[in-house]
Design a protein with these regions (language model features):
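Hydrophobic alpha-helical segments within soluble ligand-binding/sensing domains
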Residues: 49-50, 117, 174-198, 209-210, ...
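C-terminal segment of N-terminal export signals and the immediately downstream linker at the start
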Residues: 11, 33-65
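Beta-alpha junction/loop-to-helix N-cap segments that form part of ligand/metal-binding clefts
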Residues: 50, 76-83, 95-165, 233-240, ...
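N-terminal secretory signal peptides
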Residues: 1-17, 21-41
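Extracellular/periplasmic bilobed ligand-binding domains
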Residues: 212-307
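Solvent-exposed, acidic/polar segments of extracytosolic/periplasmic ligand-binding ectodomains
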Residues: 45-48, 373-425
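An alpha-beta-alpha
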Residues: 70, 171-235, 254, 331, ...
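Extracellular/periplasmic periplasmic-binding protein-like sensory domains
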Residues: 271-344, 355-360, 408-425
Length: 425
């Protein structure tokens, strides 16, 4: 399969095939199953066979990059990703590292500014010569750095659920794409709530706009239902009373919200202040994880639904071990959202892929990626598809007053990623 950089003009059949039969969950710890550990320790990787040309790799150390916003409006969402990636790196190093080398990381701040992301990505790849980068949150930041990764042949592990319509040799997308989140979530809410009318909201940049474009097409063309309104707000916006009044007048069955970052705090507080009870008014979000609720306050969003692939409350051995380790490293009061968990997958998937390839070489890592599976994933189990997205389950949760989600729905099996669904471009 060609991994030229594809955009929305590439079509592939719309599929939501389910992977039948998933591997058993690891019940031991959040490290990969013991078989993985034994296999890694048993293999020998002579330096001569480890292609490190042009990369910051020595016989004892390999350097990677971490690139997220820890300042600005996106810090509320991205801080957890940094914490998860550092936890994974610490655990991998405790296990012996990657190809016998300990991981060193260089962290850069994207500062919630897309040109800054591109500048920092170039620094990491050209000056620091990192072997991979774990980074970005918004699609705007990913779009800003993608030409840099393709020009300088770097490897990005991108953790956020996103709109799809993209594929690159130089990116592993560890979050969900549109068919796994937007379409699956709309199907669930229509069936479960008998919804007939929707009001679409979003922050004003590529991910919410493209996602709502996909949502509108699905609502109108597939479900044969009605969109009553669609509005967007600049990142960092704090005034939502006008649109809240419009929604109170139009009375949609479902508010579909893709508001991002710190704006969520103002939106949900103002929604509650306006008397909108989310236990009575159905609201579905694909952008509010436990990380955002930590700032919003559980009492301001209780009753809302979120369609994700991970919630901190998931009851499986891998997740319990992950949550315990996360709290031990970052404090008992820290919360873990969907993107935080997907960010945690990045270093582990990179380690497993590098060891499959027997090399840090970017082209070899890209070629070895399809089929790599991580049975120790907190969400349960993931596997890299040939399109560089992940097979994963889709889940719906309902927000509680304590800032966690109750799991109310999950697919029986993994959903196949289809970043170019026919009819949605």
């Amino acid at each position: 399969m060609s991994f030229e950089h594809h955009t929305g003009d590439l079509e592939s059949p719309f599929r939501r095939k389910l992977l039948l039969g998933t591997a058993a969950l690891s019940a031991a710890s959040l490290l990969p199953p013991q078989a993985f550990v034994q296999q890694a320790l048993a293999q020998q990787f002579p330096t001569a066979k480890v292609s490190t040309t042009g990369l910051a790799v020595t016989d004892s150390e390999v350097t990677v990059g971490i690139l997220h916003s820890v300042t600005g409006t996106m810090a509320i969402s991205e801080t957890g990703s940094v914490e998860a990636e550092k936890l994974a790196i610490e655990q991998i190093n405790a296990q012996g590292g990657v190809l016998g080398r300990k991981i060193k990381f260089i962290q850069e701040d994207g500062a919630s500014d897309w040109p800054t992301f591109a500048e920092k990505a170039k620094k990491l790849l050209v000056n620091d010569k990192v072997a991979s980068v774990m980074g970005c949150w918004t699609s705007a930041s990913r779009k800003a750095v993608l030409p840099v990764f393709e020009q300088y042949n770097g490897m990005l592990y991108y953790p956020t659920f996103y709109e799809g319509l993209e594929q690159s040799k130089n990116v592993i997308y560890t979050g969900q794409e549109a068919t796994q989140q937007i379409i699956a979530g709309l199907d669930w809410v229509q069936k479960t709530k008998a919804a007939k009318t929707f009001y679409l909201l979003g922050s004003d940049y590529i991910w919410p706009r493209t996602s709502n474009k996909i949502a509108r097409k699905h609502i109108e063309n597939v479900l044969k239902l009605k969109v009553l309104g669609e509005e967007y707000f600049p990142l960092g916006s704090t005034q939502f009373n006008s649109v809240i009044n419009k929604m109170k007048l139009s009375k949609p069955d479902v508010i579909y919200a893709i508001i991002v970052g710190g704006s969520n705090v103002a939106f949900y507080k103002q929604l509650k202040a306006a008397g909108v009870d989310l236990n009575k008014q159905t609201l579905m979000t694909i952008s509010v994880t436990e990380d955002e609720i930590d700032g919003i306050g559980g009492e301001n969003i209780v009753g809302a639904y979120a369609c994700m692939k991970y919630f901190q409350s998931l009851d499986n051995p891998n997740n319990k071990a992950f949550v315990s380790a996360f709290h031990k490293m970052w404090g008992d009061k820290t919360v873990i959202g969907d993107v935080t968990q997907a960010a945690y997958l990045g270093p582990w998937l990179w380690k497993l892929t590098v060891e499959k390839a027997g090399s840090f070489d970017i082209d070899k890592v890209a070629a070895a990626s399809p089929g790599v599976e991580f049975k120790g994933a907190p969400e349960g189990y993931v596997r890299i598809h040939e399109n560089h997205h992940l097979w994963s389950k889709t889940r719906v949760g309902r927000a509680r007053t304590d800032g966690q989600y109750d799991l109310v729905y999950e697919t029986a099996n993994l959903m196949e990623p289809d970043p170019f669904p026919k009819g949605y471009q």
